[in-house]
Amino acid sequence: MRRVLRLLLGCFLTELCARVCRAQERAGHGQLAQLGGVLLLAGGNRSGAASGEASEGAEASDAPPTRAPTPDFCRGYFDVMGQWDPPFNCSSGDFIFCCGTCGFRFCCTFKKRRLNQSTCTNYDTPLWLNTGKPPARKDDPLHDPTKDKTNLIVYIICGVVAVMVLVGIFTKLGLEKAHRPQREHMSRALADVMRPQGHCNTDHMERDLNIVVHVQHYENMDTRTPINNLHATQMNNAVPTSPLLQQMGHPHSYPNLGQISNPYEQQPPGKELNKYASLKAVGSSDGDWAVSTLKSPKADKVNDDFYTKRRHLAELAAKGNLPLHPVRVEDEPRAFSPEHGPAKQNGQKSRTNKMPPHPLAYTSTTNFKGWDPNEQSLRRQAYSNKGKLGTAETGSSDPLGTRPQHYPPPQPYFITNSKTEVTV
């Protein structure tokens, strides 16, 4: 249809130009000739273009159609991790070309990125996968495990730590063994302190009586009564005994804490009692009191000093404290008073009191008023207890036996309630 239209248009223009030219010939021959040439050239060009397009369409319709490219086939291979990747076809739409690298392959749409699979060599099992060891790199030297010193440092550190632990353990054991006796003594003292104080007087009394029995053994070997007879006579006026005797019975105890020992244990006499017994034996060698007194006045003086110190320590123990420096006890004249002096002890009447056989044992307590001047009730208690012990030693009903007549007869005394008590 286009060709027909073009031909018709060309004919129409040609006819128009011919008519125009004829008209111009009449008016002006030159101008019309030029205009007609231009129209002819334009029509010729258009007709040539139309004829060229028609020839191309005929050629295209006559040529056979081109074939589509076949999809590529990617071969199976071992990747960089040693895993086997199976083969696959690239037939999904436009992704028909096998692209990528030898270790990683995929499908793509660009032909220019196609992979040349014939150049890859990872189609067989690698050697390092068979031996289980990675291949040695060319730039690394051969590794010699015998020259590796890293394990030696670990061994040295562990050895030093083990030695330090052993030294600490043995040091601790040595210190515990060195301090064990002190701990035993401290625990024993604490256990004695924490015991009930109600049994202290009875235990002290029984221990003191056991020691007195030993003294009587050295003084008189003839008569002796059981120690149980003395329990009923001295239970009411029992006071804490001398801490010197406690220290002789227990060398590791503390005098101010009132240590307690087993009342049934027989305590051996201490150094002072042995000295007293030896001096007593020297003083009573001939059996006569007068003769022995004339022969050994020094022995009697030592005995009197011993009993004086003993009673003084008993009074201080009853108050609960001991002097930090030695106190000299001076002798004073003896007092004459009725034999039965009433004295109250803790609100109770004491029993019959007599003068003990040792006059120097009951001296005035005015020298100790610096410790506790208002402690009059304790002083009365000490005097009452001393008189009681003197009665037990000299009376005929003494449970420990009759004392030998080595001392003058007891002298009466009495105690007043005055704070400034003077003995005449």
From Swiss-Prot:
Transmembrane annotation, as ranges: 150-170
Signal peptide range in chain numbering: 1-23
Topology in membrane: Single-pass type I membrane protein
Any single biological process term in GO: regulation of short-term neuronal synaptic plasticity
Keywords per UniProt: Cell membrane, Cell projection, Glycoprotein, Membrane, Postsynaptic cell membrane, Signal, Synapse, Transmembrane, Transmembrane helix
Residue positions the entry lists as glycosylated: 45, 89, 116
InterPro entries: Shisa (IPR026910), Shisa_N (IPR053891)
The keyword Hydrolase appears for this protein: no
Lipid biosynthesis among keywords: no
GO MF terms held by the record: PDZ domain binding
Region of interest (Disordered), residue spans: 333-424
Any one GO CC term of the record: postsynaptic density
Quaternary structure and partners: Component of some AMPA receptors (ionotropic glutamate receptors) complex, at least composed of some AMPA receptor (GRIA1, GRIA2 and/or GRIA3), CACNG2 and SHISA9, as well as low level of DLG4.
UniProt family annotation: Belongs to the shisa family. SHISA9 subfamily.
Protein name, UniProt field: Protein shisa-9
Phylogenetic classification of the source organism: Eukaryota, Metazoa, Chordata, Craniata, Vertebrata
